[in-house]
Amino acid sequence: MEMEMEFLRKLPTPQELKEQFPVSTEVVAVKAQRDEEIRNIFEGKDDRLILVIGPCSADNEDAVIDYISRLRTVQEKVKDKIFIIPRIYTNKPRTIGVGYKGMLHQPDPEKKEDMLKGIIAIRELHTRAVKETGFTCADEMLYPENHRYLSDLLSYVAVGARSVEDQQHRLTASGVGIPVGMKNPTGGDISVMMNSMIAAQHGHTFLYRGWEVTTTGNPYAHAILRGYVDKFGRNIPNYHYEDLQNLLEHYEDVNASQQTTLANPAVIVDTNHS
């Protein structure tokens, strides 16, 4: 038997969905402005800190908009020190593969999975976020082939601890035009994360959504430190001075190797998994 897989229906391409659910010129302008500010922070031209903040997953559109609308007030109070990127995570990696997988799979948690409604729902949610709050947001790049459904709306993506060793994630990250945070894996090996950043900062030729594509590399690929569980089942934190010093030494080792360099060295500490 060739495939144990039932093909249910062909979904619209990202281009088709963008034509069906276009963004306004105002949304385009907001994203361009925020993307520039974020680049300036990563390049060291702006000394503000980036704060990616929000719930574990987005499962209710109105609740998400209410939450990030409140962040707008917070942003005004801290705008000289902190640049807020709301976290709207619309797909969830599952440790054992079962359970609620996020709005992309199941736009209504009380109903059955529907991927067509899901891709529409996540696009409408991110569009509404920009229009109503002025925030472009962050999402997890759980499925690299789906990134272009939201590529005109997002200002930040993360590659999770379970995905960071995957080649397609690394190569796709090399071609997105926004910062990509690479997490250390669940076992805590910093070198895996560093290798992922090196791959993402270099150009590649590969297959993507039925095309042969080429990329120039993403100079804003960077580290996300998360806590982990060691081989003895102990929870190891990620936020101590020693952890940051260790990461700095890894950056320095890479840039001293003469084989490659990492542009715009940066770190975000994942306090959800500290």
Annotate the PLM regions:
Residues 1-45:
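N- or domain-start disorder-to-order transition segments that initiate the globular core
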Residues 2, 68, 81-250, 257, ...:
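Active-site-facing alpha/beta catalytic cores
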Residues 39-47, 256-264:
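Glycine-rich phosphate/diphosphate-binding loops that line cofactor/substrate pockets in enzymes
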Residues 50, 83, 266:
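Hydrophobic "anchor" residues on beta-strands that sit immediately upstream
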Residues 54, 269:
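Conserved, mostly hydrophobic/aromatic
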Residues 55-62:
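Short, glycine-rich nucleotide/cofactor-binding loops
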Residues 247, 263-267:
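Active-site/ligand-binding-proximal alpha/beta "capping" segment
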